[in-house]
Curated annotation (Swiss-Prot):
Record keywords, A-Z: Cell cycle, Cell division, Chaperone, Cytoplasm, Isomerase, Rotamase
Annotated S-S bridges: none
Domain remark text: Consists of 3 domains; the N-terminus binds the ribosome, the middle domain has PPIase activity, while the C-terminus has intrinsic chaperone activity on its own.
The name this protein goes by in its record: Trigger factor
InterPro entries cross-referenced by the UniProt entry: PPIase_dom_sf, PPIase_FKBP_dom, Trig_fac, Trigger_fac_C, Trigger_fac_C_sf, Trigger_fac_ribosome-bd_bac, Trigger_fac_ribosome-bd_sf, Trigger_fact/SurA_dom_sf
Catalytic activity as recorded in UniProt: [protein]-peptidylproline (omega=180) = [protein]-peptidylproline (omega=0)
Enzyme class: isomerase
Pfam families cross-referenced by the UniProt entry: FKBP_C (PF00254), Trigger_C (PF05698), Trigger_N (PF05697)
Native organism: Desulfotalea psychrophila (strain LSv54 / DSM 12343)
Any one cellular-component term (Gene Ontology): cytoplasm
Length: 441
């Protein structure tokens, strides 16, 4: 095997591999002999077809199938012999059988960027200090009280706090919008789920009343169908129900769960759950801040194909989130081209961060052990009610173990960095603040 390596760019190498005729021709002959025993051509008995006819009819097929095998069998040996460290699958750009009987293929591969690792220990990170206010607990209990309330139909105009059943149809420039229509829609007046302007129009309306209402929605409205648009609504009230709220006493707490004997126990449980959720959210924030701090000062080039792959994964995630709301990219006013443009810098930083973490893992000899894998399998099993064996079988059947191991390795490296970091307490924040930061970073 003859191997030549050429530098195409700082991070791309062209690997030219030539296999001698002595290695190639016996395999070609073996392929033809196998076909000779199997194929059936009119005018010849099976196994008696002349070799020249076999070659004439099947040359392209044999060479195509064999070239794929020859590349697969020799590519990894070639890059290993040359000491290359590919970080992407090869792009096979040239495959040819030479006149002397040899075989040549050219592979373009992306290699790991070379950079100096700076300081990664003792990073100063602000640790979110979480706290649960009594007002938050009272608000949650009030929401429980509201949900548990009995609903009674009333013959009067609707007021805040009522539940109104309404049919509505939205129009834009006189055309009915199929996605802005609902029958028997339950509107909780004052909750704000339908928007203040929409709910304000229903206040004062009674069963059987109809009304027209125009609303201009802001550009930052969460519903991508109506954001930034002026919509004309036709409303029809079907009925009005008022809530009969239960007293907030020990009996209410008992109705909330068998484990509660008093209102104090219910409040203690809510506080513990909220603190746990805040702490979990804070962990994500700390990891994000660690990565941000770690990346400061690094601008080394990363392989464009890895950035493109990361961008594709981000777009898939966006598509999945939209699908959960019954939307497509087009319906949301987005396109893959636009998202690629918006995501490229974030994707490059993620790829850069991954290279940084892997270099730290090499220096610190951090590896994924069997017990790390088992913990990872158990964590997923707990989420989806599966056994460790079932989770393991799932990953093996999909050939997804390597991405999973990479995720576990990154978690382990981040845990190491956190153990070496200097944590500075931040002011106490509410759950929404911590969760918002974790989602945005």
């Amino acid at each position: 095997m003859d191997i030549k390596v050429e530098e195409v760019s700082k991070l791309t190498r062209k690997v030219i591999v030539t296999l001698p005729a002595g290695d190639v021709q016996p395999k070609i002959e073996a392929a033809y002999n196998k076909l000779k025993k199997e194929v059936k051509i009119k005018g010849f008995r099976r196994g008696k077809v002349p070799s020249a006819i076999i070659v004439k009819n099947y040359k392209d097929q044999v060479e195509a199938e064999l070239s794929e095998k020859l590349v697969q069998e020799n590519y990894f040996n070639a890059v290993e012999k040359e000491g290359l460290d590919p970080v992407t699958h090869p792009e096979i750009q040239v495959v040819k059988y030479n006149e002397d009987g040899s075989f040549t293929f050219e592979a373009h591969v992306d290699v790991r960027p070379d950079f100096e690792l700076g300081n990664y220990k003792g990073l100063e990170i602000e640790k979110p200090a979480v706290a649960v206010a009594d007002e938050d607990i009272d608000a949650e209990i009030a929401e429980m009280q509201k949900k548990a309330a009995a609903l009674h139909v009333v013959d009067r105009p609707a007021v805040d706090g009522d539940m109104v059943t309404v049919d509505f149809q939205g129009f834009e420039n006189g055309e009915a919008l199929a996605q802005v229509k609902s029958d028997d829609h339950q509107v909780d007046l004052g909750a704000g789920s339908m928007g203040k302007d929409f709910e304000a129009k229903l206040v004062g309306m009674s069963k059987g009343e109809v009304a027209d209402h125009q609303i201009t929605f802001p550009e930052n409205h969460p519903n991508v169908i109506i954001k930034g648009k002026t919509i004309d609504f036709k409303l029809s009230v079907k009925d009005v129900k008022e809530r009969i709220l239960a007293d907030l006493d020990d009996e209410f707490a008992k109705d909330a769960g068998e484990e509660f004997n008093s209102m104090d126990e219910l409040k203690a449980s809510i506080r513990a759950r909220r603190i746990k959720k805040l702490e979990e959210s804070a962990e994500g924030v700390i990891s994000d801040r660690l990565m941000q701090k770690l990346l400061e000062g690094y601008e080394f080039e990363v392989p464009t194909r890895l950035v493109a792959h990361e961008s594709e994964q981000m777009i898939k995630q966006t598509e999945q989130q939209l699908q959960q709301s019954g939307l497509t990219l087009e319906a949301a006013g987005l396109s893959k081209e636009k998202l690629v443009e918006e995501n490229v810098e974030v994707a490059a930083q993620r790829v850069r961060g991954d290279f940084l973490l892997k270099k730290i893992a090499e220096v610190e000899d951090i590896k994924v052990a069997d017990e790390d894998m088992d913990r990872g399998f158990k964590r997923i099993g707990d989420m989806y009610n599966m056994t460790v064996a079932q989770v393991k079988e799932f990953f093996q059947s999909r050939d997804d173990l390597l991405p999973f191991m990479n995720e576990l390795l990154n978690e382990k490296i981040l845990a190491f960095l956190r153990s070496e970091a200097v944590m500075v307490e931040e002011k106490a924040v509410e759950a929404t603040d911590v969760q918002k930061e974790g989602a945005s970073e």
